[in-house]
Amino acid sequence: MKEMKRCLAAILLLVFMLCALSAPAEETETPVPLYRATATCAITIRAEPSRDAEAVGYYAAGARVLIVSWEPEWLQVVKGDVTGWIIRHTVTDQVPIDKTMQPFGWVKNEYVADIGSSCVLREAPDDDAQALVVIPEGERLALLSIENGWGKVMYWRTYAYLKMDKRVASIEPILPVEDAQAGDILSAYCSFYPLKGELVPGRLVNIRLGCEYICRVVEPGERFSFNEIAGPYGPAKGYKKAMSFYDGGTAPSYGGGTCQVSSTLYNVLMPLSGRGIDIVYRRSHGASGATYLPHGTDAAVGADALDFIFRNEFDFPVCIDARSHDQGVVYIALIREE
């Protein structure tokens, strides 16, 4: 009997081993692309989001690119059975594959932080990490998340981190539309600008004026045109000469800097696109975009063909709260009204 049991055990072990050997290897699912774009140049696909990572593929200039996800400086793409990463600014004409998706590049901030006393944004969530910029008292920042005592902020074309200590006076959550009551924040975004450089004093004035002009209530069904409300961008309306993005470079013009206000507003509204906000018209600054935001998320204004237009399709009014205090930060929020 014992010999028979040993034989059965050996047979079972052999069967399990054969099954394991014959079982097909677990297949890795190919990520589903959400957006398509066009390569503006020859692009190397990297295994990781790093210029030093292994090359795993290639796009020729003009090739169709399928985008899975994005980081401030990188895009995750899929080409055939290859999944990898490319530098974000090497593509253009990014559009959703599913028309119900939000525009390319949208991010949803989760909190708004009021700065009670001067604090520092760092390049990593660590007290010893490099300081990127000092945020003065009285500013508001939109936070992507809060983890382990650090708030994560979209900063130019990268991430920055804010220590959530006593220098942060208060934190307010950004609520889902279905939970929001009058006075609650539906969406918020902040962008940053330099305080030194050519014609910067005029740019500070223009950004502040642009914010002041667009602070208003938008009623249900109302169409909002940035040019109609904040323009014309001349001295009669208080605007100064400052540097503007033009044809891939910069040039001085009246109202330079107002595009940062319209672009920040666009990023506020993108998460709500098709969910209460209809983005009617938007144009970028061209293939290079605007460097104060991740590539592909700017909204140029100024000329007849350059305007940012949206419509409030909620069944309640919304209020645009836009601020800039000449201290390097543009903060804009959309608030539910009665």
Task: Give the predicted meaning of each segment.
Residues 4-25:
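Sec-dependent N-terminal signal peptides of Gram-positive bacterial secreted proteins and lipoproteins
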Residues 25-44, 57-61, 68-71, 92-120, ...:
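SH3-family beta-barrel domains
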Residues 39, 66-69, 142-143, 279, ...:
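A structural signal for short, hydrophobic beta-strand segments that form beta-sheets
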Residues 46-48, 121-126, 335-338:
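Core beta-strand residues in small-molecule sensory/regulatory alpha/beta domains
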Residues 49-54, 125-130, 210-211:
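Short alpha-helix capping/helix-loop boundary micro-motifs
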Residues 52, 58, 70, 128, ...:
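Solvent-exposed, acidic/flexible segments
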Residues 56-89, 133-165:
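SH3/SH3-like beta-barrel superfamily modules
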Residues 102-106, 136-137, 146-147, 168-338:
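Well-ordered beta-sheet/strand-loop patches within structured domains
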